Amino acid sequence: MIPSLTILWPNLSAPAIEETRFSYKFCHSMSKQLCEEAGLRVSWVNYSGDPTLGEMLPGIDGDRVLVVTDPETVLSAPAVIAMIMCIENGFIACGPVYNHTISPDQTAALPVSYVDIETYLEVAEMIAEREENRHSAVESLDPACVLYRLDCLEQLPIECRLSEIPPSITNLNIGEVAVAKGALVHYGFKNDFEREDLVELVPESAKRILDIGCAIGGYGKRLKTVRPEIFLMGVEQNPVMAQSAERYYDDVVRCPVEEVNLTDNFDLVNCGDILEHLRDPWSILKRLNSLLRHGGYLILSVPNAGHWSVVRDLLKGRFRYVPAGLLCVTHLRWFTESSIRNALEEAGFSIETFQRKQIPPTPRGQAFIRNMCAAGYGDEKSLTTNEFIIRAVKR
């Protein structure tokens, strides 16, 4: 029988970024849902700031306490159970493995990548089965998510704050802390990728580049590293992100892409995962065409609405928005290979390079694709493609 536990969850103010605000709510509600669906006996306690143990202990129900300090964390029932089993083996505290973490000891060896909640759960189950009851003692844990024995927490000073628990409990010298190798916890929905895949498509002839929707500047950071001589201008409507991007760009225009007023002739326009967020991407493509010199380039990436994970969810009557990914909450438009090809053609572009980014499907995904294609209802190339990477030339 799984012991009851209390989960302390951070109630933090999200930055003024729509996806992040959604992510904070999504991760909390999804973690609760996944634990409840598995029948776990969990008491949830929200906290603000960095409270002391004296403030939190009276609200704890059960002899196990899971302290979450990062609101962009998704818990799965297999992960919670694996951590509890680790504690049952005599450790005073236990942490999970993550998809992303600051701790090398807690980096998950994923058998396959996941792309949404359903595939995350599938991978979490695979890891829990593969690493059943495996744990390893470590010197320290990533504080994002740690399970403690209540009796150990009660030995700490009541003025000890939640952020101080990890080093303080280690200093008690009353037992070891460990990592539950079968406990996969998802962390993070931040999109700060440097997009090397798009940077690699920039031709040597491009000297003046416009980056639409530059976010916090990951693309510019990478591009300026390999091509420091390039003049790089970004467009970003979110002031928080724009301020971050200014470190890597020669200029950042703070406004919606629909309102940008530029007359310069650029050698290249970069549009990484932007079209799907716009109300009228077809008009924007024509506008971007007008900003390019004759023979100039448009490099873009766009998610594929025909990916197997989306198709499978639709067939099951599901359409679950997520903070980032194929079904990002801020997506307004959807493209397949034929529709993005048509949009570029009508906007005055000729496609020079067309790449299909394909994350290997999970075992259940492979079975779904195989069955759909065998029944004549699916195209394997489309079902296995999660994103299109395109370089087009202005005609």
Protein language model features and the residues they cover:
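Active-site nucleotide-sugar/metal-binding loop of Leloir-type enzymes
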Residues: 53-64
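S-adenosyl-L-methionine-dependent methyltransferase catalytic module, highlighting the catalytic core
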Residues: 132, 136, 140-144, 154-157, ...
